[in-house]
């Protein structure tokens, strides 16, 4: 299974390379790239199974996020991991924001990575879903109300302001905020903001259930 790593940190590249080797991926099938141009070329040449990208590699140039988005869309059979460039925050969780895109951080546990990759490999091999690891591969989806509220929340509105604007009780706002935190798997507002911004940058945004 060809694997591509785009990360400027030697330690991370080595760690991911050793990790994938321990899973049976041959060293010759693990490729490091240093920029988006190389990433695009290697994805087209190798049709990788997995791509690891550090957000730091594409947040500093204006059109980079758009190019990453394009690469992800062009390779629906490849599983992309994006590590958030977020300091001093411990986030061990992961979020499927698309069927082939997971947002996480470098604090992710190897056991979690094991489960995510085995679920992906089972899906690729069309093995019985009954023996899947049980991990949820449904992309993160918010209700329309949660989505509207999240936008206000990110714009700096507090619970009372949101309550007034949406004409719902403050208790209901708090309940919706609780649901958003549960779905994004964190109570840390900084992580929530970061996830939303990153998802907006590399996709068309968090899915909204418009039923």
Curated annotation (Swiss-Prot):
NCBIfam families to which the protein is assigned, alphabetical: PRK15411.1
Keywords: DNA-binding, Sensory transduction, Transcription, Transcription regulation
Transmembrane region(s): none
Ranges of the DNA-binding region feature: 159-178
Domain annotation HTH luxR-type: ranges: 135-200
Top-level taxonomic group: Bacteria
Function of the protein: Component of the Rcs signaling system, which controls transcription of numerous genes. Binds to DNA to regulate expression of genes.
Protein name: Transcriptional regulatory protein RcsA
Signal peptide: none
Family annotation (Gene3D superfamilies): 3.40.50.2300
Organism ancestry: Bacteria, Pseudomonadati, Pseudomonadota, Gammaproteobacteria, Enterobacterales
Cysteine pairings via disulfide bonds: none
GO molecular function: DNA binding
Record-linked SMART domains: HTH_LUXR
One biological process term in Gene Ontology: regulation of DNA-templated transcription
Protein family: Belongs to the RcsA family.
Pfam families linked to this entry: GerE
HAMAP family found in the cross-reference section: RcsA
């Amino acid at each position: 299974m060809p694997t591509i790593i785009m990360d400027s940190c030697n330690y991370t590249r080595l760690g991911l390379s050793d990790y994938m080797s321990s899973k049976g991926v041959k060293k010759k099938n693990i490729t490091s790239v240093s920029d988006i141009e190389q990433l695009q070329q290697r994805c087209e040449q190798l049709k990788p199974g997995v791509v690891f990208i550090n957000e730091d590699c594409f947040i500093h140039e204006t059109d980079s996020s758009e190019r990453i988005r394009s690469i992800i869309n062009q390779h629906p059979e490849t599983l992309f991991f994006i590590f958030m460039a977020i300091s001093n925050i411990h986030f061990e969780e992961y979020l499927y924001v698309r069927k082939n895109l997971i947002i996480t951080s470098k604090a992710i546990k190897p056991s979690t990575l094991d489960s995510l990759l085995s679920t992906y490999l089972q899906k690729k091999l069309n093995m019985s879903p009954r023996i899947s690891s049980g991990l949820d591969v449904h992309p993160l989806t918010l209700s329309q109300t949660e989505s509207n509220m999240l936008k206000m929340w990110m714009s700096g509105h507090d619970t009372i302001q949101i309550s007034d604007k949406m004409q719902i009780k403050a208790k209901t706002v708090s309940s919706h905020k609780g649901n958003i935190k549960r779905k994004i798997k964190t109570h840390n507002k900084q992580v929530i903001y970061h996830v939303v911004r990153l998802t907006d940058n590399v996709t068309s945004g968090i899915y909204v259930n418009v039923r």
